[in-house]
């Protein structure tokens, strides 16, 4: 009897240490702290905007106590996920990688989508922005890598209804002009039946804009550069999270199809896959 009591007590202590699984709309996001270090200042300066097309908005995945989101069942389209009532969140982590400064920005979504249909619970998406040196007054953006899903495509009558992606990142060096906040495209001349030349006016040289949309005609939802301005979310860097939140993101099980890309377990491997040079 004493053994059973001790075992149950240990389970309770472990659960308290790791936090609980709570409703997707009950997770309190972290407020964006004032940046102090060089890496924090660069991350805030180059934080991207996110635009949502036909899928869930981004939600916080963990709170200060280490409680983890339970996500949403992959049914009923965008029901219950068109607005994050407590606010959205973008997560960040930076490091030197093969002589370039890599800044990962990651978003969590409570549902995953294929071809405009909600299909499963949980999705992590991320963007890696590559700089020359974060210590410079205005670092140069060398390129960007946007995550995509390599899941098997659904089948119709045993026939795949699309093409399965082989690479987990799309890569751009340099970033296309329309990938920057505020940029407008102006058609200047026609050079073929469906071909034109363009000029690009205005826009930032620092802040990028990406969409959670469908880069292919049909397929799994993923990140892509977009022609519309979006919204910023409060940024919390990996080292700014509480110990409980970091521990929760290390141990949380979001399923076999999506992983936390910026935790200790996955960060280096993600940068290797995202490397565009």
From Swiss-Prot:
A motif (Hepta-peptide GHRHDWE motif) lies at residues 119-125. The keyword Nucleotide-binding does not apply. Key residues/motif important for the effector activities are degenerated in most NLPs, including the nlp24 peptide consisting of the conserved region I (11-aa immunogenic part) and conserved region II (the heptapeptide GHRHDWE motif) that is important for phytotoxic activity. This is NLP effector protein Pc109095. Residues 1-19 form the signal peptide. Pfam families: NPP1. It comes from Phytophthora capsici. It comes from the Eukaryota. It is found in: Secreted. The keyword ATP-binding does not apply. GO terms for cellular component: extracellular region. Transmembrane segments: none annotated. PANTHER family: DOMAIN PROTEIN, PUTATIVE (AFU_ORTHOLOGUE AFUA_5G00600)-RELATED. Secreted effector that contributes strongly to virulence during infection by P.capsici. Induction: Differentially expressed during the developmental and plant infection phases. Glycans are attached at residue 199. Belongs to the Necrosis inducing protein (NPP1) family. Keywords: Glycoprotein, Secreted, Signal, Virulence.
């Amino acid at each position: 009897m004493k053994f059973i009591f001790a075992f149950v007590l240990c389970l309770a202590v472990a659960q308290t240490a790791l936090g609980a699984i709570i409703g997707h709309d009950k997770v309190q996001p972290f407020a964006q702290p004032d940046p102090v270090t060089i890496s924090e200042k660069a991350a805030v300066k180059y934080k991207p905007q996110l635009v949502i097309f036909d899928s869930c908005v981004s939600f916080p995945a963990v709170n200060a106590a280490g409680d983890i989101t339970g996500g949403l069942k992959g049914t009923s389209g965008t029901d219950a996920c068109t607005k994050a009532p407590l606010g959205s969140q973008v997560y960040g982590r930076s490091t030197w990688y093969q002589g370039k400064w890599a800044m990962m920005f990651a978003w969590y979504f409570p549902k995953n989508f294929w071809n405009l249909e909600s299909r499963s619970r949980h999705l992590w998406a991320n963007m890696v922005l590559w700089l020359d040196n974060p210590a410079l007054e205005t670092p140069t953006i060398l390129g960007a890598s946007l995550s995509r899903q390599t899941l098997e495509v659904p089948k119709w009558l045993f026939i795949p209804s699309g093409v399965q992606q082989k690479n987990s990142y799309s890569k751009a060096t340099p970033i296309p002009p329309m990938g920057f906040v505020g940029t407008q495209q102006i058609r200047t001349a026609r050079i073929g039946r469906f071909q034109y030349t363009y000029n690009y006016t205005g826009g930032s040289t620092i802040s990028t804009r990406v969409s959670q949309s469908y880069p292919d005609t049909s397929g799994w939802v993923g990140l892509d550069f977009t022609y519309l301005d979006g919204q910023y979310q409060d940024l919390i860097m990996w080292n700014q999270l509480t110990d409980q939140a970091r521990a929760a993101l290390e141990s949380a099980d979001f399923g076999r199809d999506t992983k936390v890309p910026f935790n200790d377990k996955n960060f280096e491997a993600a940068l290797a896959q995202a490397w565009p040079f």
